[in-house]
Regions:
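Small beta-barrel nucleic-acid-binding modules, primarily SNase/OB-fold domains
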Residues: 1-128
Length: 128
């Protein structure tokens, strides 16, 4: 799978259905998005859940992670395909988001405390 770079475009937050059919580009949360109708997940990191959060703190940090990823990608990015898919039923493409300045967006989220390594056990945001 090859997806080209985007230069300085605002990335929408996802809404509505039929994203593959509509070929949308948007962010679901801090580690999942769609690029022209292809669903992807960030490789090697996990951000807090926003839809099925186990505690309020997880939801709050998850929202921060999503907005931070949106801001990072707005400066331009490219998706680097790892060649793999996740093991969930969704079979999302595992990608790295490489920012226009060469940084890996996932690593930025890790350094800022908005993500943890993936796969992992437990939920550090809810104290377990």
């Amino acid at each position: 799978l090859i997806l080209t770079a985007k230069e300085g475009l605002a990335i929408d937050l996802c809404s509505g259905g039929n994203r593959a059919e509509r070929k949308v580009t948007c962010l679901v949360d801090g580690d999942t998005g769609w690029e022209r109708g292809v669903k992807w997940r960030l490789l090697d990191i996990d951000t807090p859940e926003t839809f099925e959060a186990e505690c309020d703190r997880e939801k709050q940090i998850g929202e921060k992670a999503k907005l931070r990823l949106q801001a990072l990608m707005a400066g331009g990015y490219r998706l680097a395909d790892s060649g793999g898919k996740d093991r969930t039923s969704e079979r999302r493409y595992l990608m790295r988001v490489i920012l226009s300045d060469g940084r890996d967006a996932g690593q930025v989220l890790l350094r800022e405390g908005l993500a943890q390594r993936w796969p992992n056990k437990g939920n550090r945001w809810c104290g377990r």
